[in-house]
From Swiss-Prot:
This is Fructose-1,6-bisphosphatase class 1. Its cofactor is Mg(2+). Its EC number is 3.1.3.11. The keyword Cytoplasm applies. Substrate binds at residues 112-115, 199.
Length: 345
């Protein structure tokens, strides 16, 4: 690994044609905005950031925090000189249209996990860059068409995770020089990790295949997986994804039976698509339980379409898919545990 590599240098070497130059400009602009957002978060109440509701709701119906609004403004301002055809943001009901002949469109969540601000927990920014095809409705291509994707983690360090379609690199913000420096190159998701992340309070609402997988993990060394597992749940998508990239495991935000959760809660364009692209580029996998996330396309009328997300180590994602597609797989693997989970319903 080149210890002197920076995000800016990587983008310079990548920008070899007009479309790649637009991608590089977009990633660079988001990186610049993320430095501003990181400083706001770091100042917290000293900068007037309290986690209080702003008084409005975003396009998804979530109550906006004051930092949601400031993060959105920072990103829109940073992208003003980038040649884009359209922007799709969690914080905006409609697309922000640019030059219809521009080579790219950009989808982003300016501040994922903003409900964590007042508890001083990890939040982040997520983005996806796709090619623009003049005459075709923006953001209707499958996720496999993404040119670049990534996310920023505002934690103890501010880290920038990026794929340009050729592996995944992780950069950390050098606060002294205000540049992102490469710390991990061509990251690979570990396969043999005994960790899974899911909000277990929703167990009664899950479909049976999700219950079966969790029951296998809970059974530990005495169960069909013959291994003790730890359950994690941070409630921050970027933090969960970063942990998986650095030490493996699997994250589940499945569909469930609650009203409004039939397609999960995460948004396809600016949450599940970019996360799935990052995971696959790092040798992992991402599925809804039944379909590869990168095979999904958004409807032209649904910028904020939802999708379940199961991502992480390929072996675990594949096992969950197997349980969805072949329910008898649970009883074949371990009849004692297939329907006798540790949670009673």
């Amino acid at each position: 690994m080149d210890q002197g590599q920076t995000l800016a240098r990587l983008l310079d070497s990548y920008a070899t044609d007009p479309r790649k130059r637009a991608v590089a400009a977009a990633v660079g602009a988001i990186a610049e905005a993320s430095i501003e957002i990181s400083e706001l978060i770091g100042q917290g109440a000293l900068a007037g950031i309290t986690g209080a509701a702003h008084g409005a709701s975003n396009a998804d119906g979530d109550v906006q925090k004051d930092l949601d609004v400031r993060a959105e403004a920072a990103i829109v301002a940073a992208l003003k000189n980038v040649p884009y055809a359209a922007l799709a943001s969690e914080e905006a009901e409609a697309l922000l249209m640019g030059d219809p002949q521009a080579p790219i469109s950009i989808a982003y969540d300016p501040l994922d996990g903003s409900s964590n601000i007042d508890t001083n927990m990890t939040v982040g920014t997520i983005f996806s860059i796709i090619p623009n095809e003049p005459g075709v409705a923006p953001f209707t291509a499958p996720g496999s068409c993404q040119l670049a994707a990534g996310f920023v983690v505002y934690g103890p360090q501010t880290s920038f995770v990026l794929t340009l379609g050729d592996g995944v690199d992780i950069f950390t913000l050098d606060r002294k020089d205000h540049v992102y420096r490469l710390i991990r190159e061509k990251v690979k998701v570990a396969g043999d990790t005994a960790e899974y992340a899911i909000n277990a309070s929703n167990h009664r609402h899950w479909e049976q295949p999700v219950r079966d997988f969790v029951d296998e993990c809970l059974a530990g060394a005495d169960g069909p997986r013959a291994k003790n597992f730890n359950m994690r749940w941070i409630g921050s998508l970027v933090a969960e994804a970063y942990r998986i990239l650095t030490r493996g495991g699997v994250f589940l935000y499945p569909a469930d039976s609650r009203p409004g959760y039939g397609d999960g809660r995460l948004r396809l364009l600016y949450e599940t698509h970019p996360m799935a692209f990052v995971m696959e580029q790092a040798g992992g996998a991402a599925s809804t339980g039944r379909e590869r996330v990168l095979d999904l396309s958004a409807a032209a009328t649904s910028t904020h379409q939802r999708s379940p997300l199961i991502m992480g180590s390929s072996d675990k994602v594949n096992r969950i898919v197997e349980l969805h597609l072949d329910p008898s797989a649970a009883s074949r693997t371990a009849p004692l545990f297939g329907r006798r989970g540790l949670f009673r319903t």
